[in-house]
């Protein structure tokens, strides 16, 4: 899978999910905290730049292997 760059649209820490807007302007992608790479508390900040891959989830496309850049 190819890495895609994007920006966090919003992320709800208490619910553990949010959405990423891909840099190419395509449809926002769902992101779950379990897809965030790294140790410790996994969260994303609104406006944060990230790289990720897209995988088909139960409710449509979802971001996986998410890393901050």
From Swiss-Prot:
Q: Tell whether Transcription regulation is among the UniProt keywords.
A: yes
Task: Name the UniProt key words of this record, in alphabetical order.
Answer: Activator, Cytoplasm, DNA-binding, Transcription, Transcription regulation
BP GO annotations: cellular response to heat; negative regulation of termination of DNA-templated transcription; regulation of gene expression
Q: What cellular component GO annotations does this protein have?
A: cytosol; membrane
| Keyword Transcription among UniProt keywords | yes
The GO molecular function terms of this record are:
nucleic acid binding; protein homodimerization activity; protein-folding chaperone binding; RNA binding; single-stranded DNA binding; transcription antitermination factor activity, RNA binding
The cross-references to Gene3D superfamilies, in alphabetical order and at most eight, read: Nucleic acid-binding proteins
| Cited SUPFAM superfamilies | Nucleic acid-binding proteins
Where does it live in the cell?
Cytoplasm
> Residue limits of the CSD domain?
6-66
- What PANTHER family does the annotation carry? COLD SHOCK DOMAIN CONTAINING PROTEINS (PTHR11544)
Q: What is this protein called?
A: Cold shock-like protein CspC
């Amino acid at each position: 899978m190819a890495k895609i760059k994007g920006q966090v649209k919003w992320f709800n820490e208490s619910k553990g999910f949010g959405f990423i807007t891909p840099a190419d302007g395509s449809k926002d992608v769902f992101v779950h905290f379990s897809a965030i790479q790294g140790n410790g508390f996994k969260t994303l900040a609104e406006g944060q730049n990230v790289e990720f891959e897209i995988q088909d989830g139960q409710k449509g496309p979802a971001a996986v292997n998410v890393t901050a850049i």
